[in-house]
Amino acid sequence: LKCNKLVPLFYKTCPAGKNLCYKMFMVSNKMVPVKRGCIDVCPKSSLLVKYVCCNTDRCN
């Protein structure tokens, strides 16, 4: 699986066991992702932070 880094022009290949891509936003500013990368379990969103996870190459 390949996941975009913070700047979507760049990506990395996820290590074994991390088979989801994610991006994280501040709820107050959904237009600007704060983090992107590989993850094993999608974190729950909170009042301040929203996570979006997916499982195809460079989907984040």
From Swiss-Prot:
Chief place where the protein resides: secreted
SUPFAM superfamilies named in the record: Snake toxin-like
CDD domains per UniProt: TFP_snake_toxin
Stretches assigned to coiled coil: none
Entry's localization field: Secreted; Target cell membrane
Family: Belongs to the three-finger toxin family. Short-chain subfamily. Type IA cytotoxin sub-subfamily.
Role summary: Basic protein that binds to cell membrane and depolarizes cardiomyocytes. It also possesses lytic activity on many other cells, including red blood cells. Interaction with sulfatides in the cell membrane induces pore formation and cell internalization and is responsible for cytotoxicity in cardiomyocytes. It targets the mitochondrial membrane and induces mitochondrial swelling and fragmentation. Inhibits protein kinases C. It binds to the integrin alpha-V/beta-3 with a moderate affinity. Is cardiotoxic and cytocidal to Yoshida sarcoma cells.
Protein name from the UniProt record: Cytotoxin 5
Organism: Naja atra
